[in-house]
């Protein structure tokens, strides 16, 4: 299955946004110095990616996409398991975005594209989910 | 007669001593009275200073300086309030800028206290707060205390 969702706006706070299981609550993430160095933190079936700036950003979610990202500032890849169909993405006290990602194992890659490099003229986080 | 006088004197001494202890410990002006004085709130949040000491100190200092200890959740206005509160505080490499009241609170925005905090402390604190508040709707008033 190949799918790309349209970009959705998210207000970033505390330099992070979390990908977590549908119908659950984002867990407390322990942002150790090591996690900050790696650019992500993980807990309870969820992943929080570091965001460069606290501002309005776009989340572009893609499943098994073959499109490449040419201009980006940072790229982080982590394994992720979807326990039931569907995931959410939110930052701290932001609105909640939903994606109907099917149950299964994935490699999640988060590409950080700063506003000056983005066609959307705002910080953009492209998240590629690749089935494994 | 003499016994009654002694009893009365002892009673007065006990009352004065109790009042003095209460004043020293601050009991007369904390907890219940403060709660009823300050404000209305729907929920309370005991923020853990042992886990996020820098952020906790900032919250405590800001409240002592007169900033609100109650946060009225208002997600939609967060972006604008953050711009106002951070406009004169440049970013600094290796630090996050922590705001109190937080940008998601109606009480935040222009004039909010802003402090440079280590990212590990501040981002953990943000995650902790988000975990506890995420299900509260806009308009919920949360009283923060430092534990």
Curated annotation (Swiss-Prot), chain A:
Membrane topology per record: Peripheral membrane protein
A biological process from GO: establishment of competence for transformation
Subcellular location as annotated: Cell membrane
Annotated Gene Ontology cellular component terms: plasma membrane
Key word Transcription regulation present: no
Gene3D superfamilies according to UniProt: Competence, DNA-entry nuclease inhibitor, ComJ (2.60.34.30)
Family matches, as Pfam families: ComJ
Chief localisation class: membrane
Superkingdom, natural source: Bacteria
Keyword vocabulary terms for this entry: Cell membrane, Competence, Membrane
Biological role: Plays a role in the competence of cells to be transformed. It inhibits the activity of the DNA-entry nuclease.
Subunit annotation: This protein is a subunit of a 75 kDa protein complex, which governs binding and entry of donor DNA. The complex is a tetramer of two subunits of the DNA-entry nuclease and two subunits of a competence-specific protein. Only the complex is able to bind ds- and ss-DNA.
Name listed for the protein in its UniProt record: DNA-entry nuclease inhibitor
Gene behind the chain: nin
Curated annotation (Swiss-Prot), chain B:
Principal location class: membrane
GO molecular-function terms, A-Z: nuclease activity
Parts of the chain that traverse the membrane: 8-24
Cofactor(s), names only, from the UniProt record: Mn(2+)
GO cellular component: plasma membrane
Signal peptide from the UniProt entry: none
Record region (Disordered): 75-100
Entry-linked Pfam families: DNase_NucA_NucB
Membrane topology (UniProt): Single-pass membrane protein
Keywords in alphabetical order: Cell membrane, Competence, Hydrolase, Manganese, Membrane, Nuclease, Transmembrane, Transmembrane helix
Note describing how the cofactor binds: Mn(2+) ion stimulates activity.
Coiled-coil ranges (or none): none
EC number: 3.-.-.-
Alphabetical GO biological process terms: establishment of competence for transformation
Record entry for activity regulation: The activity can be inhibited by the 18 kDa competence-specific protein nin.
Cell compartments where the protein resides: Cell membrane
Family as reported in the entry's similarity comment: To B.subtilis NucB.
Self-association and partners: This protein is a subunit of a 75 kDa protein complex, which governs binding and entry of donor DNA. The complex is a tetramer of two subunits of the DNA-entry nuclease and two subunits of a competence-specific protein. Only the complex is able to bind ds- and ss-DNA.
Reported function: By degrading DNA that enters the cell, plays a role in the competence of cells to be transformed. Degrades both double-stranded, linear and covalently closed circular DNA.
Name of the molecule in the record: DNA-entry nuclease
The species this protein was found in: Bacillus subtilis (strain 168)
Gene: nucA
């Amino acid at each position: 299955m190949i799918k790309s969702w349209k970009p959705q706006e998210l207000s970033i706070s505390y330099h992070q946004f979390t990908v977590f299981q549908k119908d659950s609550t984002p867990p407390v993430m322990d942002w150790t110095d090591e996690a900050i160095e790696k650019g992500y933190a993980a807990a309870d079936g969820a992943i929080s990616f570091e965001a460069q700036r606290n501002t309005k950003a776009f989340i572009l979610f893609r499943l098994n996409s073959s499109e490449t990202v040419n201009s980006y500032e940072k790229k982080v890849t982590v394994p992720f398991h979807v326990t039931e169909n569907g995931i959410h993405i939110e930052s701290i006290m932001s609105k909640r975005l939903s994606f109907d990602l099917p149950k299964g194992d994935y490699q999640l890659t988060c590409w950080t594209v700063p506003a000056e490099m983005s066609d959307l003229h705002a910080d953009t986080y492209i998240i590629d989910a690749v089935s494994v | 007669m003499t016994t009654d006088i002694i009893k009365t004197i002892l009673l007065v001494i006990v009352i004065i001593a109790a009042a003095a202890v209460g004043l020293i410990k601050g009991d007369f002006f904390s907890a219940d009275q403060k709660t009823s004085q300050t404000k209305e709130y729907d929920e309370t949040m005991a923020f853990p200073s042992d886990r996020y000491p820098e952020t906790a100190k900032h919250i405590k200092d800001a409240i002592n300086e007169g900033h609100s200890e109650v946060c009225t959740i208002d997600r939609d206005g967060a972006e604008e309030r953050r711009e106002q509160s951070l406009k004169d505080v440049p970013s600094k490499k290796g630090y996050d800028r922590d705001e109190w009241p937080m940008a998601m609170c109606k009480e935040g925005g222009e004039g909010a206290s802003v402090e440079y905090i280590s990212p590990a402390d501040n981002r953990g604190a943000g995650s902790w707060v988000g975990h506890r508040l995420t299900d509260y709707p806009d308009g919920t008033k949360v009283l923060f205390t430092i534990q």
